[in-house]
């Protein structure tokens, strides 16, 4: 299982790289779960990241505005992101989610056929009126995405496992794999919860808080020693 770590600036990206993270995922925590950072931060992070190491960028907890979201996705791709992550926050149905992701995929793949598109839903979608997380694999498949992902929308200390049972998460992973895509799971995941994700054959685990001082995604800073500990668990 590979590790995605989400820095908010280049200094944190260096810590994540030195700690052994596999994917450097640029985000902006004050703007939400999948908060979008600025194009120059993505560009600077890409320049600071070793060649051959993948850079991801979240483009926000997005509304149902396909044109707006597609432009943001293209901006992230052009700024140097290899993975473009879209948080389907404001989509209320399969059709709305598909509409957003289909257009994003078209724009991103037109900019570079090796770019990777991630459709992200929320395990706690019921708290924010979002689309059912269990339809995300189907949305991702039908839109031509590469990865189906789950995160949590509300960052209040509750983790992915507080909102979905391990059985449901396993179902999500298996359906994603059945469609020939990779599966990524995140959501205030603690280091001791990572082995459970390995057991259900998750491909990518995403963290920020667990790699930050005081375990705080907002006030803390990513530290390479904490990243090293998480890498060790992922590799066991």
Swiss-Prot record:
Species: Methanococcus maripaludis (strain C7 / ATCC BAA-1331)
Similarity remark: Belongs to the MfnB family.
InterPro entries referenced in this protein's UniProt entry, alphabetically: 4HFCP_synth (IPR007565), 4HFCP_synth_arc (IPR035081)
Protein name stated in the entry: (5-formylfuran-3-yl)methyl phosphate synthase
CDD domains: Aldolase_Class_I (cd00945)
Gene name of the record: mfnB
Task of the protein: Catalyzes the formation of 4-(hydroxymethyl)-2-furancarboxaldehyde phosphate (4-HFC-P) from two molecules of glyceraldehyde-3-P (GA-3-P).
NADP listed as a keyword: no
Residue positions of the active site: 27, 85
Entries under Pfam families matching the protein: 4HFCP_synth (PF04476)
MF GO annotations: carbon-carbon lyase activity
């Amino acid at each position: 299982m590979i590790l995605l770590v989400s820095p908010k600036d280049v200094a944190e990206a260096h810590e994540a790289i030195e700690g052994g993270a596999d994917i450097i995922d640029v985000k902006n925590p004050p703007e939400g779960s999948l908060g979008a950072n600025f194009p120059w931060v993505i560009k600077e992070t890409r320049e600071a990241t070793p060649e051959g190491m993948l850079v991801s960028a979240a483009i926000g907890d997005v509304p149902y505005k396909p044109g707006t979201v597609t432009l943001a996705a293209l901006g992230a791709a052009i700024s140097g992101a290899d993975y473009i992550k879209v948080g389907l926050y404001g989509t209320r149905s399969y059709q709305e989610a598909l509409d957003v992701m289909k257009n994003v995929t078209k724009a991103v793949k037109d900019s570079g056929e090796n770019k990777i598109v991630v459709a992200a839903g929320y395990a706690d979608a019921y708290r924010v009126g979002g689309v059912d997380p269990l339809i995300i694999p189907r949305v991702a498949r039908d839109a031509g995405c590469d990865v189906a992902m789950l995160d949590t929308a509300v960052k209040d200390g509750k983790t992915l496992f507080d909102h979905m049972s391990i059985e449901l998460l396993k179902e999500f992973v298996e359906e994603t794999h059945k469609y020939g895509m990779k599966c990524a799971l995140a959501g205030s995941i603690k280091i001791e919860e990572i082995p459970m994700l390995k057991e259900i054959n998750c491909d990518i685990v995403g963290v920020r808080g667990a790699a930050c001082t005081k375990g705080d995604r907002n006030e803390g800073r990513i530290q390479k020693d904490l990243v090293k500990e998480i890498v060790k668990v992922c590799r066991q």
